[in-house]
Amino acid sequence: MKNSSQKEPSIFNLAVVVAALGYFVDVYDLLLFGIIRVPSLASLGLTPDQVKADGEIILQWQMWGLLIGGIVSGIIGDKRGRLSVLFGSIVLYSLANIANGFVETVEQYKWVRFVAGLGLAGELGAGITLVSEIVPKAKRGVATSLVAGIGLTGAVLAYFMKELFDWRTCYFIGGGLGILLLLLRISVFESGLYNQVKTTSVSRGNFLSFFSSADRFKRYILGILIGLPTWFVIGILVTFSNDFAREFGIQDKIDPGKAIMYAYAAISIGDILIGLLSQYLQSRRKALFIFYGITIAFMIAYFTMLWGGSAAQLYWICAGLGFGTGFWAIFVTMGAEQFGTNLRATAATTIPNMVRGMLAIFILPLFKWFERQPSIGYVDAGIYTGLIIMAITVVAAALTRETFHKD
């Protein structure tokens, strides 16, 4: 097979296709716990209150795995090559998901989700980095948005698997999909740009480099902060939509797995459209601000229009929230483009996983802190957390460099 540098760049080349399929499996496994959280924990003998409390703990452990795994896989990706991460990560999370089908206690559950998080961390960043280096800059936003748009439908598949099979079988299916992807991934080739970096004396994959320069540190932190709304929306508003529904007085039974499915179906559409929008505007930042506005509009709808509402209303508002936060690939691409090829995989892998990890270390703890205050209830805790998240994000985006024309 020819090296990627000898091929005519296209948004439909092998790297883009395999990255999209890889992200599809990644999202299936990443969101599966949120989708089957209630039935799986209930089958272990937990009460509804324990399902809520232990579900939050297990989710935090998974996100800690993503946070740590993102750092490790980013460094390995730059030092040993993208393929080492793409192969290693898929083996780890495939085996973890198969093991997840055998858990019998909450303790086992949280440890297996932690290991799965370690593996899942490497999938999107390494794939997006390969795509961003192979596809020319004029088509890069569209290509990465296609990867995310196709990949995010993995959550839709996870929901329908949950409807058709027992929760343990759903985990076995996730592991099986990973193994099938591993066989396909043999054909993936390394990025030509990255191969050029291997021959230079530039330091590759030094995670501490982000902290050795004030300018690099600023770019790195801003890259994380512009993505915060995604996991506030998915990790709090959508995943725990059944708990919010009780507070809103919704009488219909709410399936948080269905809410996640609605959200991710819309996210996949948003992720493709934002790529086209950024192409039309010739700006990633302008497209990002438009989608922030959509997110804020549906947050307002979530907290004002659902009191005494119906399940259908909640699901459609979750879809609107999903569409508004359909900027995942664009923000990951912006993060990768802030740095040279020597640090691009480290940035592209650690930044999105730092955002995912922020659910465990900042977003969920902030939400729980507000909830514990005597004069603040569950819904108000969500409102205050959302206000803080969006304020931080908008300021960060305003301070972030435009990267659309950066090679």
Predicted regions and their residues:
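Extracellular/periplasmic helix-loop-helix junction of adjacent transmembrane segments
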Residues: 36-68
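Conserved MFS/SLC helix-loop-helix module at the cytosolic interface between two early adjacent transmembrane helices
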Residues: 68-104
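Helix-breaking motifs and short loop linkers at transmembrane-helix boundaries and internal kinks
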Residues: 81, 102-108, 282, 305-308
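Cytoplasmic helix-loop-helix junction between adjacent transmembrane helices
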Residues: 112-149
